[in-house]
A protein has these predicted regions:
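Composition-driven recognition of glycine/serine/threonine/acidic- and proline-rich low-complexity segments
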Residues: 1-178
Length: 178
């Protein structure tokens, strides 16, 4: 399972790298079972890789024909999200224009990365997967993960992504209720 996520994100990273015109580095994927509140605690304390207190989340819900469902999340520190959008739109884009387009640009980045991952996983498992439109939310870690009971056990596949030239990092999380 870890290798499947690693392969799927490798393809998505190439697309993201082309968008921001910068090399993207990936961490080794971690796949584990954890309670939802424990994941929130780790993200808040920075144990999951030094993530800031406020994050921007790009979320899409996916379902297979046989009823399997997952939420795929792309998380970036809130302060880094504007830099990602600036890299996407180009160096000469005004700060005012970037702020106006931030939500749409983040949704598009999430759409590209998450759908590329899910498409690769669907191909790998020989399954058809349908997904929702991406939703962008910037908030505290606790609020980003409060959509289900905190004690719910979930399967988490976490892969870190970083843009070393700009000291930005984020995570792709696949959350599956078990």
């Amino acid at each position: 399972l870890t290798e499947a996520f690693n392969l799927s994100l490798g393809e998505a990273t190439a697309a993201f790298s082309a968008i921001v015109r910068e090399e993207i580095e990936l961490s080794v994927p971690v796949v584990e079972f954890v309670a939802r509140d424990e994941l929130a605690r780790r993200l808040q304390s920075g144990q999951a890789g030094g993530v800031e207190d406020r994050l921007c989340r790009i979320n899409q819900h996916f379902r297979t024909g046989d009823g399997f469902a997952t939420d795929a999340l792309l998380l970036f520190p809130e302060q880094g999200s504007l830099e990602i959008v600036r890299r996407m739109l180009g160096e000469d884009t005004s700060a005012e224009h970037i702020t106006e387009l931030e939500q749409d640009a983040l949704a598009e980045i999430g759409n590209i990365i998450i759908n590329s991952c899910m498409s690769s996983l669907a191909d790998l498992f020989g399954s058809e997967i349908t997904g929702s439109l991406p939703r962008v939310q910037c908030s505290s870690v606790a609020r980003l993960l409060d959509d289900k009971a905190p004690e719910n056990l979930i399967l988490v596949a976490r892969i870190g992504m970083s843009m070393s030239a700009h000291n930005l990092s984020g995570f792709v999380l696949f959350l599956m209720d078990v």
